[in-house]
Amino acid sequence: MKGTGIPVQEKENGAPDTVQENGGPDIRTEERLAYFIRMLSDDNDTNRWKAAELLGRMRDPDAVDPLIDTLWDDDSRVRLKAAWALGQIGDIRAIGPLRRLYRMENEDSQEIITEAIEVINLRTGQQ
């Protein structure tokens, strides 16, 4: 039986705009996830940044690998938003790549990366 969807945002660039009211799996949520993962490869850096932001807010572990790939984006804003998103998801798989990125970034960027690592450690009970 298909659940009733509730609007979460106006459609933009064809993105699905509903989620299941009962919080269960919903094809629309899966479509949104796939859409935002595709947007991580968009030519427009602002679209990539927004996609990373939204994936972080969704907190879906299926976004971890694509976000890890995004840590090497040419645009530093996109890289840092991907680092933030990985912290929000809280998956231990992101720790190694975040540490590698840390060594490549400036001091200001390192603060954001450190915060993401700390959030992951808190969420997973790591030290």
Question: What residues fall within each predicted segment?
Answer:
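Alpha-helical segment of the N-proximal tetratricopeptide repeat
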Residues: 19-26, 31, 35-58
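HEAT-repeat alpha-solenoid elements in large eukaryotic scaffold proteins
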Residues: 8-16, 41
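Short inter-helical turns and helix N-cap capping residues of alpha-solenoid HEAT/ARM repeat scaffolds
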Residues: 43-44, 74-75, 105-106
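Amphipathic alpha-helical scaffolding segments comprising HEAT/armadillo-like alpha-solenoid repeats
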Residues: 3-6, 26-39, 60-72, 91-103, ...
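Asparagine/serine/threonine-enriched low-complexity, disordered tracts
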Residues: 4, 11-13, 22
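Conserved hydrophobic register position within alpha-solenoid helical repeats
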Residues: 51, 82, 113-117
